[in-house]
Amino acid sequence: MKNMCSNWWLSEHYSDKFVKESKKCKYRSRAWFKIDEIQKKNNIIKPGMVVLDIGSSPGGWSKYSSQKVGMSGKVIACDIDLMNPIPNVSFILGNIFEKITIKKIKKVKKKVHIILCDISPNITGLSIIDHSRWISLNNNILNICKYLLLKNGKLIIKSFNSVEIKNFCKKIENSFKKIKIFKPISSRSRSKEIYIVAVNYKL
């Protein structure tokens, strides 16, 4: 059964038009199209900004952000997995939820204008467990904002469309003045992933 599922996933992956297009354009991953769509709809990333990309590897969002902020801005990428270098991107190897990693980030920039997070928890396929893991991860990322996000800063975070998401959105509304829930066209249709775009951090 495991091999059948793996073969099905590989077949779907390589027939995906966004996977094909990302290879054709030499993007680091199909996630490039997601951040591009979010950016075009919301105009979040601007020249001169400092961006923190949490869970950055293989670097699709970091490279995209680097091009948007330009040489007057800066991108800090953080992941537990190594990532190939990108111009104007400072990569920090480490777990964002550990104090030592936050200290390393603060050595580059004390606070940032935008936090991006496209990471997912380990998925089991059991809804009750997966929903709980998503909300736990989302809450932990929201907590990171206290240490690293500037006042009036912005957050783009991946989440999971479920009943629990309403309560999490209320939490975000306590910290940000405005939020949007967004599902990019480039997300697979069967996927329940959504993106929360939050602006004007209240600090």
Curated annotation (Swiss-Prot):
Catalytic activity, as annotated: uridine(2552) in 23S rRNA + S-adenosyl-L-methionine = 2'-O-methyluridine(2552) in 23S rRNA + S-adenosyl-L-homocysteine + H(+)
One Pfam family, short name: FtsJ
GO cellular component, one term: cytoplasm
Superkingdom per UniProt: Bacteria
S-S pairs: none
EC number: 2.1.1.166
Residues of the active site: 158
Keywords, ordered alphabetically: Cytoplasm, Methyltransferase, rRNA processing, S-adenosyl-L-methionine, Transferase
Broadest EC class assigned to this enzyme: transferase
GO molecular function terms listed in the Swiss-Prot or TrEMBL record: rRNA (uridine-2'-O-)-methyltransferase activity
Positions with a binding annotation for S-adenosyl-L-methionine: 59, 61, 79, 95, 118
Chief localisation class: cytoplasm
Entry's localization field: Cytoplasm
Recorded family membership: Belongs to the class I-like SAM-binding methyltransferase superfamily. RNA methyltransferase RlmE family.
UniProt function note: Specifically methylates the uridine in position 2552 of 23S rRNA at the 2'-O position of the ribose in the fully assembled 50S ribosomal subunit.
Name used for this protein in its record: Ribosomal RNA large subunit methyltransferase E
Record lineage: Bacteria, Pseudomonadati, Pseudomonadota, Gammaproteobacteria, Enterobacterales
